[in-house]
Amino acid sequence: MVEYLIVILANLLVGGMIGLTGIAGFLLPMLYSGFMGMPAAQGMALSFFAFLISGVLGAWNYHRAKNLDVRLGLLISAGSLIGASLGVWLNLLMDESLVKRILYLVVLASGISILLRKDRDRKTGGREKLPAWGMVAFGLVTGALCALSGAGGPILVMPLLVVLGVPVKTAVGVALFNSIFIAIPSCIGYSLQ
């Protein structure tokens, strides 16, 4: 009974944080597999199910507020759908301790990208324009890394979009939308293990 209460409270707290900032999902795999001792695949499946729900609700709200660039989201998500499937497959081939290290590196990379954005703003202040194939490739790589590590998506996608010059609210909306396309193959893949 206590475990169910922890899961519900953690999902509500993390879901709220994801909706506000686009970041926080990385806490769930750590909680489930680390603190609660769930098998890694079960913790990942449960985490990605929560990411799916927060992605749908968050993307819908950002779309209604006109803070979702649907074209950009679809381009990134096309790559993420394939990348996430690849990430799940790679995760199942790797040692669990290596996967945890990758999660920590993804979180670190997210923080570094935020610092880079502050520095780049001072130098240029402009928005980078990447070609469509570049956005699909971006989605492929970030989808694979997020599904592999359990990071969810927005923790890596949102700050990198901001580094590329996407306005913060739009970056959060796109990252939440994209997290749906990372969560679907990840949730299914980890559930089947």
Give the ranges of each region predicted by the language model.
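Conserved, well-structured core segments that form the ligand-binding/active-site neighborhood
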Residues: 151
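Juxtamembrane transmembrane-helix boundary motif
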Residues: 1-42, 57-148, 158-170, 192-193
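Transmembrane helix-bundle signature of multi-pass membrane transporters/permeases
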Residues: 44-52, 172-183
